[in-house]
Amino acid sequence: MAIAAPARGEDIHQLARAVDEHYNHLRSLQSDFTEIYRGDGLERVESGTLWLKKPRKMRWEYRSPKEKLFISDGRIVWFYLPEERQLRKTEFRKLDDLRSPLAFLLGKTKLENELQGLSKVVDQAPVTAGNILLRGIPQAMAGPTNEVQLEITPADQIVRIVLLEADGATTEFRFTGWKENVELSDSSFQFTPPPGVETVEGELGP
């Protein structure tokens, strides 16, 4: 008598491996994003476009409600605020930022190593029916972030990331229109500040 294979999502290890395999073979990614912050009775919604390139290169272009730019070349991180004429700069290895987990999507990521106690979320529904929600404790951000939730599509794509912070706030990233292995120049992940811009070394701030 044949034994049916477990339904997708019942085997966490199998699902984690499928997500790993999907992203680890990619060279680059592009997506539109919406970032939603909720905390202290406030809600802040921002949106723009994200580009990722192996290894650890990121470019977040925020367009709404204000323009700002978050760039990593894998070694240095720049956060440019045009309205304030200010550039914040730090080393990637010192980065403790809510955007940083995405930098490790392209490479040799192992989801179960990044998120301790990885399990299926059963007390919440995904935003899109048919997707699966996973939760785990982030190894790299265990201090400021208590839990990370990932919404995974049947095609093993991550379309939503929710970070539950220690102070009770949540930051949610929603991704749409993923494009894989797009041609991206390394120059897209470099930044030269315009004349007259103040440069602040160290913490990137909010």
Predicted regions and their residues:
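N-terminal leader/targeting segments and the immediate start of mature chains
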Residues: 5-44, 193-206
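Flexible, surface-exposed loop/linker segments and immediately adjacent secondary-structure boundaries
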Residues: 85-131
